[in-house]
Design a protein with these regions (language model features):
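Flexible "cap/lid" subdomain of the alpha/beta-hydrolase fold that forms the substrate-access gate
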Residues: 1-9, 13, 17-20, 28, ...
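Short beta-strand element of the alpha/beta-hydrolase
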Residues: 27-33
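Short, conserved structural micro-motifs that define repeat-unit consensus positions
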Residues: 33-39, 61-63
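Serine-hydrolase catalytic-loop signature spanning alpha/beta hydrolases and amidase-signature enzymes
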Residues: 36-44, 55
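A short, Lys/Arg-enriched amphipathic alpha-helix followed by its capping loop at the start of a domain
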Residues: 44-53, 93
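A short acidic, amphipathic alpha-helical/loop segment
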Residues: 44-45, 250-253, 279
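Catalytic histidine-centered segment of alpha/beta-hydrolase-like enzymes
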Residues: 269-277, 281
Length: 290
């Protein structure tokens, strides 16, 4: 499904076995997917980016083809701080001591945490369809917040959300794709089938641990950084979908977190790499350079 020009490899970092797609040549570029997807979400933009970059697109720990240990009751093992550190080690193992990172959804949360915790490693940061975790929690009220059901449902104590997610994963995935996008047909049947195949009980465990970490750990890490005035130093591109009204204030939010921010809005909803690749790709290409 991913372009044939990319090689599929596995790398063990700590206790996580990462499935990684690698292709292209040039400056290293790490692409990080979100929920409920895998590296496959990048297949419409990765080939063009690989013309000028060495593109590395892993499945996040526990997602898709990447296996990882069970998380703790508060999501220990799946905090974005821990995930970011593992991926920095992965990039170092591949010979990349500095690199650009582009993240979508949960992957964008790993990406900005990476830029905060490892500023000497990150040359450029692009975040798609998010604001920082603590900012999101502080703004979840009213009608638009109904769309953020995973934040509280999947963070409930085990095993309730794992069982709910595993009971009918097709319904969960279709609901997310159909209600978070402006054009559900953009998430094509082949992609939906691949995401469904990847939604195993093991993956459900990891996803719930990811959301528990968001509730119990990640927002505390964000709160500490905000209180201490710690900001992202890397040039930062933020992109949101025009229909994401709950992110109308995203540019101002990101400018309080990063020193250099370029804010863009493109037609579409939450799944921009698949909904609007023709709009996202030029923005990324210009921002990342050759």
């Amino acid at each position: 499904m991913f372009p044939d020009a990319f090689d599929q490899k596995h790398f063990l970092v700590e206790e996580t076995d990462y499935l990684v797609m690698i292709g292209g040549a040039g400056a290293p570029l790490l692409l990080l997917h979100g929920f409920p997807q895998t590296h496959l979400c990048w297949d419409l933009v990765a080939p063009a980016l690989a013309e000028n970059h060495t593109v590395i697109a892993p499945d996040l720990g526990g997602y898709g083809g990447s296996t990882a240990p069970m998380g703790g009751p508060r999501g220990e093992g799946y905090s974005k701080r821990e995930m970011a550190a593992e991926l920095v080690h992965l990039m170092s193992a591949l010979g990349h001591d500095q690199f650009a990172v582009v993240g979508h959804d949960r992957g964008a949360r790993v990406a900005y945490r990476m830029a905060l915790d490892h500023p000497h490693k990150i040359t450029r940061l692009a975040v798609l369809n998010i604001v920082p975790t603590i900012e999101q929690f502080e703004r979840m009220s009213g009608g638009p917040s109904l769309g953020y059901w995973p934040w509280y449902l999947l963070a409930q104590p085990a095993p309730l959300p794992e069982r709910l997610l595993s009971a009918d994963p097709a319904a969960v995935l279709d609901h997310a794709f159909d209600t978070w996008s402006t054009d559900p047909a953009a998430i094509i049947p082949e992609h939906r089938a691949a995401y469904l195949e990847a939604m195993t009980p093991r993956t459900a465990d990891a996803i719930c641990a990811d959301y528990r970490a968001g509730f119990f750990l990640d927002r505390d890490h964000d709160a500490a950084d905000r209180a201490n005035g710690r900001r992202i130093s890397a040039p930062t591109l933020m992109v949101t979908g025009a229909e994401e009204i709950q992110l109308n204030d995203a540019p101002a939010i990101w400018r309080s977190w990063a020193a250099q921010v370029s804010a863009k809005r493109v037609p579409g909803g939450h799944f921009l790499p698949e909904e609007a690749p023709d709009a996202v790709l030029p923005l990324l290409a210009q921002f990342l350079g050759g």
